[in-house]
């Protein structure tokens, strides 16, 4: 049996770098919901495709948004 050709995964481009965003607002919950899982956890950098600086900014914005009760800390267990 021949091995299937292994494809290189396409590098994800940071959306914030591409759009030249300098500030991620914690009040923009529709944007931040893209970066949290259905269980309420912050998605990893390799999953979201953010650069390290913007991943830190997203994490800080999500944490601030949780503190202000705009986003949940966790989803309901069952």
Swiss-Prot record:
UniProt family annotation: Belongs to the bacterial ribosomal protein bS18 family.
Protein name: Small ribosomal subunit protein bS18
Pfam families per UniProt: Ribosomal_S18
Assembly, per entry: Part of the 30S ribosomal subunit. Forms a tight heterodimer with protein bS6.
GO terms under cellular component: cytosolic small ribosomal subunit
Entry keyword set: Ribonucleoprotein, Ribosomal protein, RNA-binding, rRNA-binding
Domain of life: Bacteria
UniProt record, GO biological process: translation
Record-linked HAMAP family: Ribosomal_bS18
Function: Binds as a heterodimer with protein bS6 to the central domain of the 16S rRNA, where it helps stabilize the platform of the 30S subunit.
Keyword flag Ribosomal protein: yes
Listed InterPro entries: Ribosomal_bS18 (IPR001648), Ribosomal_bS18_CS (IPR018275), Ribosomal_bS18_sf (IPR036870)
Gene Ontology molecular function terms on file: small ribosomal subunit rRNA binding; structural constituent of ribosome
């Amino acid at each position: 049996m021949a091995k299937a050709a292994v494809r290189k995964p396409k590098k994800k481009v940071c959306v914030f770098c591409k759009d030249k965003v300098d500030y991620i607002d914690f009040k923009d919950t529709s944007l931040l919901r893209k970066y949290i899982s259905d269980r309420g956890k912050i998605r990893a950098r390799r999953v979201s495709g953010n650069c390290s600086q913007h991943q830190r900014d997203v994490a800080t914005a999500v944490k601030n948004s949780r503190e202000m009760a705009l986003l949940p800390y966790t989803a309901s267990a069952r």
